[in-house]
A protein has these predicted regions:
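Metallo-beta-lactamase
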Residues: 26-29, 128-129, 136, 170-230, ...
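Active-site metal-binding loops of divalent metal-dependent hydrolases
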Residues: 55-56, 110-112, 145, 172-173, ...
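Conserved beta-strand hairpin/beta-sheet module of binuclear metal-dependent hydrolase folds
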Residues: 39-130, 240-256
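Active-site metal-binding motif and surrounding structural segment of the metallo-beta-lactamase
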Residues: 89, 118-168
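C-terminal segment of N-terminal export signals and the immediately downstream linker at the start
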Residues: 17-52
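Divalent metal-coordination and catalytic microenvironments
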Residues: 47, 99, 109, 137, ...
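Cap/insert and terminal regions of metallo-dependent hydrolase folds
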Residues: 242, 246-330
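N-terminal export signals
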Residues: 2-26
Length: 330
């Protein structure tokens, strides 16, 4: 069994404190990144340098109304209250995994891009902080085409954010969004929002067509450093990634979980944004069970920054805890 990754890094914080008019009353405090709130964490996976860079966060004011089954929202609310979490909105982190090996620089998803919002769009500044320019990025992975993952691949002038990078995505994901008809019968998304989602996905994929390469599940790249794995459900071709180097590993579960309490405690609790809710639940059960049994170190896109941890079983059933990894400063 591959052992846990080594941590040899530091947390960094820079920038100003700005307010966000979109936040609810419970979030009226100044927000944004600052020196008292670290947003870059350095570690390593075997021989590979790695960073978790926060691209910011979202507060979903719809709260538990986007979680299903509707009949079990009371249990979800009770769980949040037990952990002193707010119940009128859901806080989602945006964690970007970055790897560097020699001249290879690899980014996993790209966040929101450069936007006029103090609470998101931090990735490019984060890369510059650790000495990586946009042109230095040689490869990137697009787990799926939702805006918080794909928008950051496009600069404000509609040119590639990372002009020298190949962008790897599954053929299932690319084909679904670029086709002329779409089956959304297994999602709870608002139909009007789906129209905008398709338009945005097609526009962005068209702009990136010169960089996109199809990588089916099972594809190994960079001499086995990264393996693309099937995580279908949240989107038609949703992918996750296994990183392996010098006997150490990390599983990037991308959007399999959107909350570190709700979806781990009961993997059948599902967010209405999932494309195929039943398939998303099956994927989550499979991945959580395997990761827990194998004690695999995990990286999550939406769990609390820096997104590093492990999945720990609760008893003998299908219930788990998200166990954040201890942070180290070298």
């Amino acid at each position: 069994m591959l052992k846990t990754f080594g941590v040899a890094g530091a947390a960094l914080g820079v920038g100003s404190v700005l307010s966000n008019p979109l936040l609810g009353a419970s979030h009226s405090k100044p927000s944004g990144k600052n020196n008292s709130n670290p947003w870059i964490y350095a570690f390593n996976i075997g021989d590979v340098e790695a960073w978790s860079i926060s691209d910011g966060f979202l507060d979903i004011r719809a709260g538990l109304s986007i979680m299903y089954p509707e009949s079990e929202r009371g249990q979800m609310k009770q769980l949040l209250e037990q952990h002193s979490e707010q119940t009128d909105s859901l806080h989602m982190y945006i964690n970007i995994l970055v790897l560097r090996r020699d001249k290879e620089v690899i980014v996993f998803d790209a966040g929101f891009g450069i936007v006029d919002n103090p609470n998101r769009g931090w990735l490019i500044e984060g890369l510059e902080t650790i000495g990586i320019k946009r042109a230095d990025v040689t490869a990137a992975f697009l787990s799926h085409t939702h805006g918080d993952h794909i928008a950051g691949f496009i600069a404000p002038d509609e040119t590639p954010m990372f002009p020298n990078a190949a962008i790897y995505t599954t053929p299932e994901e690319h084909k679904f969004w670029m086709q002329t008809s779409h089956d959304f019968s297994r999602t709870k998304r608002d139909p009007n929002a789906l129209v905008r989602l398709v338009e945005a996905a097609q526009m962005r994929l068209e702009l990136l067509k010169g960089q996109i390469e199809h990588t089916p599940a099972g594809t190994k790249l960079f001499g086995g450093l990264v393996t693309v794995e099937d995580a279908f459900g949240h989107s038609p071709g949703h992918a996750m990634y296994r990183i392996e180097s010098a006997g150490e590993s990390l599983l990037n579960i991308t959007d399999i979980a959107h909350n570190d309490l709700i979806m781990f405690r009961n993997p059948s609790w599902v967010i209405g944004w999932d494309h195929d809710m039943g398939q998303a639940v099956d994927t989550r059960r499979r991945v959580f069970k395997q990761a827990a049994q194998q004690k695999t170190p995990v990286f999550g896109f939406h769990v609390p920054w820096p997104g590093l941890g492990s999945i720990v079983p609760r008893g003998s059933g299908e219930s788990y805890d998200w166990a954040p990894r201890r942070l180290f400063w070298a």
